[in-house]
Every structure is written in structure tokens, then in C-alpha cells.
Regions:
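Bacterial N-terminal signal peptides that target proteins for export
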Residues: 1-8
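Cleavable N-terminal signal peptides
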Residues: 8-10, 20
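Short, surface-exposed acidic
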Residues: 10, 56-58, 152-155, 258-270
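Sec/Tat signal peptide C-region and signal peptidase I cleavage site
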Residues: 16-22
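Short, glycine-/small- and polar/acidic-enriched structural segments
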Residues: 23-161, 168-171, 175-181, 192, ...
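Short, solvent-exposed loop/beta-turn-alpha elements that line the ligand-binding surface or hinge
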Residues: 47-55, 201-208, 274-283
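Pocket-lining segment of extracytoplasmic ligand-binding domains
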Residues: 85-86, 115, 158, 164-256
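Secondary-structure end/capping motifs
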Residues: 223-297
Length: 298
């Protein structure tokens, strides 16, 4: 069963909260991407939470979801943001709860800019770079192929880090690749690739968009500190407000926080490769649709 928290009715009464002791450290797993928590950090919003609860919030960066989930399982993280695949997997298999859907879309299948491939059906026999079967990109790729009446056996899969897809496309080592943002935006902004199909076209789940990134928390931490969890979710809505109202400032913050060149982040935001919505509640309908999608993809 996938545990979700609706509008942070945190499954425990606020009155049962255990006050954090002076300078307790809260480890928050993040990735170098367009996650709202990075905006909250760069804008100084986390300082208010630290002062209120007498804690220190430390952002710990991971390149992808699997090691992030391992760290959460080991108790090295109390809360994390990752792709929806790893986030849902954690909520299903670990003592953890999904508390927010913080980014929509993000993923796309790319081909070299000068490729003659114009549809997924033309990928038969193609060499496709992908992040591995444990990634959320894998089921998206499987569905895109199935929708084009192709099977995974009809293509050659090449496992690689998502950050390497643009390089592989540039040197023509692969015919196509599936990855997430900002790696998608990097390939587009640098003129290396173009979008063959995006995640919203493959699997629209929430308001016409794919669910790209989720925030999830260890159950023991949520039970002990529901107010902290509430504030760490609410601050992401505040960060999304900044993104929507002042995208230029948000782009500047992300550039400093994740090290990607400004044109890449600018492309992600202005071309809506990454999409943001103030309603970050993981509704039952959304999660049911997502899990059904994962099960169908195998």
C-alpha cells in the first residue's frame, strides 16, 4: 500500500508532536534539478523553519532516486524529494509517506536535432539511452513504445546516467534517449536535441500533465515531528509561488543551487519542461492512476 498524506492530515495528531531538541539536524534529500525545495533554500525560507523549531535543515544531494531511497531507509535522511517513481516506491516499500507532488512533467524522449526520426513508431531498431529499469523513465518509455505498437524487444536499450543523454545524442552514440529535467533542457538549450514526445503526451495524470517529482518522509519522523513536516511541505508551496510570480529570480536561485548554466534553467522554466502547480497534494485519484500505470508497464 502506498501511504499518502492529504493536505498534511499527517496521520497523527499535532498534539502528539515531540519537540525537537536544540539544533537537531533534519536531513533532506534533493537532486540537482528544478525542485522547489532548492528555491526555498536559496530564498532563505528554510531559515524561518529552523528558527521556529530550533533545527538545522541540511540538503543532501543525490544524482538519482535509488541511493536517495537507500539513505532514507537507513535513517540517513528524514525527508526527500525525487522522481515520482522512486517516491512512490519508497511510500510502498519503506516506512515512508508521500506528502507532496512538487513538479509536473519533466521527462521527454529526445532525438538528435538533425535526426530524421519524427515519431515513436520510427524508433524500431533504434538504440535508446535510458536511466535503467528502476527509473520512472523506463515505464514511460515502455508505454510510449506500446502506444506506437512497439515492444522493448524492438529497440536496443543502452543504460546510462540521465546526465549523459545529451552527450550521447551529440556524438550520435545513440539514436534517442529518455531523461529528465534539467538534462532535457540542457539538450534543447544547447541545440543538441529535440523532443520526440514528452511525458505529458505519454501519460497525462494530473490536469493534463505527468507527475514528475514527489516529496516523501520517514513515518517515524513524521509521527514525532508533524509540525516540521507540515512546514517543510508548506514552504514548497511558498517556493512555487515565487517560481510562478518571479521566474527570473527563481532561475537565478536554481542556477546557484544546482550548478546548471542559467540558459538551461531558463529553458526549463520558460518552455515549461518543468511545470509547477500550487496544489501539491497527492490525491488518491492521482496516485491510483500512477500506480496503475507502473503496474501495466511491468
Amino acid at each position: 500500500m502506498i501511504r499518502t498524506s492529504h493536505a498534511i492530515a499527517l496521520a497523527v495528531a499535532i498534539g502528539s508532536a515531540v519537540p525537537a531538541t536544540a539544533q537537531d539536524v533534519v536531513n533532506f534529500g534533493v537532486q540537482p534539478s528544478t525542485q522547489p525545495i532548492l528555491i526555498a533554500h536559496g530564498a532563505g525560507y528554510l531559515k524561518e523553519i529552523e528558527e521556529k523549531h530550533k533545527i538545522k535543515i541540511v540538503l543532501r544531494s543525490f544524482s538519482y532516486g535509488a541511493p536517495e531511497n537507500q539513505a532514507l531507509a537507513a535513517g540517513e535522511l528524514q525527508i526527500a524529494s525525487a522522481g515520482m517513481g522512486p517516491a512512490v516506491l519508497a511510500a510502498a516499500r519503506l516506512p515512508a509517506t508521500l506528502v507532496a507532488i512538487d513538479i509536473l512533467d519533466q521527462t521527454a524522449i529526445l532525438v538528435p536535432k538533425d535526426s530524421k526520426i519524427s515519431s515513436v513508431s520510427e524508433l524500431k531498431g533504434a538504440k535508446i539511452a535510458y536511466p535503467g529499469e528502476g527509473s520512472q523513465q523506463y515505464p514511460l518509455l515502455i508505454k510510449a513504445l506500446a502506444d506506437a505498437k512497439l515492444d522493448v524487444k524492438d529497440v536496443q536499450l543502452f543504460k546510462t546516467d540521465g546526465s549523459q543523454v545529451a552527450t550521447l545524442l551529440a556524438n550520435k552514440s545513440v539514436d534517442a534517449g529518455i531523461t529528465w529535467d534539467p538534462h532535457v533542457s540542457r539538450a534543447l538549450a544547447d541545440g543538441i536535441g529535440r523532443v520526440l514526445v514528452n511525458s505529458a503526451e505519454i501519460m497525462p495524470i494530473k490536469n493534463g500533465h505527468y507527475v514528475g517529482d514527489g516529496t516523501y518522509v520517514r513515518d517515524d519522523f513524521m509521527k514525532a515531528h508533524p509540525e516540521i513536516v507540515q512546514d517543510l511541505v508548506s514552504v514548497q508551496v511558498k517556493a512555487i509561488d515565487l517560481i510562478l510570480k518571479d521566474p527570473e529570480r527563481a532561475i537565478d536561485i536554481w542556477t546557484k543551487e544546482n550548478g546548471f548554466p542559467r540558459p538551461v534553467i531558463e529553458y526549463a522554466v520558460k518552455q515549461k519542461i518543468s511545470v509547477f502547480d500550487r496544489n501539491i497534494v497527492p490525491s488518491k485519484d492521482t496516485i491510483d492512476a500512477y500506480t496503475a500505470f507502473l503496474k501495466k508497464a511491468g
